[in-house]
Amino acid sequence: MEQLALDLGVQEFALGSGVLRFNPTDPNLYQRFMDLEPRLQELRRELLRSSRDLEDAAQVLQLLSETDRKFKDLLTWVFGAENDFSRLLQDVNLFANDEQGHSIAENLLCALEPVLTRGAEQFVRRCTQAAQEKARLRRENQ
């Protein structure tokens, strides 16, 4: 079988104990990332609702573990199955806090957002330039 050489625009970003790989200019990835925030908010609301009814620490820890898994599944949906967020984040629960009290989930999204925004802007800029070039060539050929 022959191998096709194809540049998919995938870039690598050091994250935790591994490498996160994705194409920051992929509009599909950007859309999924933008859809992630409301889903994360819903997971947080669900976590708060469910934890009110729990009476012991073991149940709360189990709920946190399940919610962490759901959010990591969403990250896999956004960035692809080749990016194992449990491994990348050294099995740290995304709802754990850093020294300033921010959740690991918030830190992760804040770190990724400017990379993806720049990628989306680059994609739009290239599309605009290509459209302008097409229009220029059409005008010249008339």
Question: For each of these PLM feature ranges, what is it?
Answer:
Residues 63-83:
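Charged, long alpha-helical segments
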Residues 6, 15, 26, 70-72, ...:
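Short linear sequence motifs
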Residues 77, 82-142:
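C-terminal charged interaction modules
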Residues 1-61:
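Short N-terminal mixed-charge amphipathic segments
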Residues 53, 61-64, 114-119:
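Noncatalytic linker/hinge segments flanking ATPase motor cores
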Residues 58-66, 96:
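Short coil/turn segments at secondary-structure boundaries
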